[in-house]
Amino acid sequence: GGKPRDVELKALFRIQGPKEANSGIQFRSKVRSDGFVEGYQADIAKETRFFGVLYDETPKRGLLAARGQRVVIDEAGARKTEQFADENELWKKIDLDGWNEYHVTARGFQVAAKINGHVMWEVTDREKDRHGDAAGVIALQLHVGPPMQVQFKDIRLKVLTEAK
């Protein structure tokens, strides 16, 4: 249980199935009364557009950062995006048929992720009434769709505390 705010999460994962297969690791998220989990999602997919991106399952947010992007979201929700690495080169660092490691860090308004040691995205999210620095649940997603298999192992969570 619990709803950590500042965390470092590492997990090995693999996804098998058709190109529509989709999953993710949700963090700083909330569970709605209908069971749907909304919030940040470090995305996992068989299709290039979504694998290794930061998606927000909250209505009206969607894709926050593609692979290789550094995004700053201000209090009004305006986004400033910088491409720090080629998304196709980062795509080549992912093993589509084997195990990969996600390493997600959330501290204050900043969230970032690596896959297999390569930085995929960095986001500073200060949008008002969102979850940029909120505490929330961690969840593993199996997306609706055709038959697929998603496996996770060696999940490690470290709750980060501020230095006193």
PLM features per residue range, with description:
Residues 1-164:
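Carbohydrate-interacting regions of secretory-pathway proteins
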